[in-house]
Structure formats: structure tokens, C-alpha cells
């Protein structure tokens, strides 16, 4: 729906939805279009360079469509910035205490880099990569503290390990008194209705299934190399 249009500037939003359910589509279409209408900016953070490249490609395609639709140049990059967590971590490690200029203000006290929304895509990254990347804690603290007063949107299909930490760290603000921040959670259940489940006793049953469904593509995993080679040989024959 359009509930996102009522998110206040210091709202905390958690979106839990399976991969492929349209989380990034919502940001790049619904939220971005609304942000452009309102003159607001989005900082979109991702955990992998390949994902960043895909999002940039989608944005450029969207620019082309909007230019054709409205007959004028649409400066989409005035309204969205896409970064990886690792880019920020690298700058922090090199001594740049504020790589996004989030805490620098102009003479009127306004941030020189002003964002209304900060999107943490695949936010389980802060937990999943922490065992081998100490930079995750550095970037998490910098980002969440620097953007306490904007809409922070955390998205993941596996957000369970981060959800309690996010709530504990961010659902309050400190001023003259302690008060809770607005908190929103949206959850989409995983639908496995499309899965056709079979229990297989041995390789012969797999071969019979393949023979009866000749037009289907098969991806087979095995925990034994010898059995896997034997099955591959039987399939070829």
C-alpha cells in the first residue's frame, strides 16, 4: 500500500521478505518515485558490489523510461545514492571518520549531505560477515548513529539475528528525556507451494524420475563423490 508515505523522519522500519519478493523493486520504484516528488534523497546501502551494479543498471533503465514518458531529462541521481558497506568500512579504516559527510553541517545547521531515507539492504550482513570482517561493527555503529534522525529501513530475508539488536540500539532517542522512536515491521511469509517434494530412497528412483520428466532441467546435489560420479554415468547411459 501507500503506508510508506506516512513514515515520519525518525521512523525505524524493518522489512522481512524472501529473496525475489520485490524489496528492491519497492525501493527503486515506489519509494524513489515518492521521494522524487517530495524532493527527498535516499541512501541505499548494499552488501555486495555486484548488487550495487545491478541496482545502478536498474536506475539508469528507469531514467530512460522516465525521460521518454515526461519528455525531459530526469536527474535520478540527485535523489538516490548507492554504496556498499565495504566502501564505507574502507574509508573508516583509512581514518575518514565521516565518509558520507553525514555529520557535517552548513552555516544554518543543516547536514550538507541530507538524506530522508537510509536503506540497509541485506542487513544480515552486519551479523553474517562479522566473524571474518571486523569492519561490520564499525560501519554499523557509524551508519546507525549518524542517521538516527532519518527514516532507517532494514531489509533482509533472514533478519532474525539482527532484529533484536536493531530494536535495542535504535528504538529510542536521547534528548531532555528518553522516548521511543516510531517502529514499523512488515513481514512476508515464504510460500513453498511451488515446491514439488519427493523422498528418494536410492539412485534408481532418481533415474526413473528423470526418464519420466524428460523436458525438465535437473540440478542434483550429493554428499558422496563416488555416488555422484556413478549417478552421472548412469544418467549419460
Regions found by a protein language model. Give the residues of each.
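Pre-Walker A adenine-sensing motif
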Residues: 1-9
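Structural recognition of the conserved hydrophobic beta-strand(s) that form the central parallel beta-sheet
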Residues: 44, 81-84, 119, 150-157
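Interdomain hinge/linker at the junction between the two RecA-like core domains of SF2 helicases
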Residues: 159-210
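Conserved strand-helix element at the start of the C-terminal RecA-like helicase core
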Residues: 41-52, 209-236
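SF2 helicase catalytic motif II
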Residues: 100-146, 151
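Conserved P-loop
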Residues: 25-70
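Walker A/P-loop
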Residues: 9-29
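Inter-Walker segment of RecA-like/P-loop motor cores
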Residues: 59-106
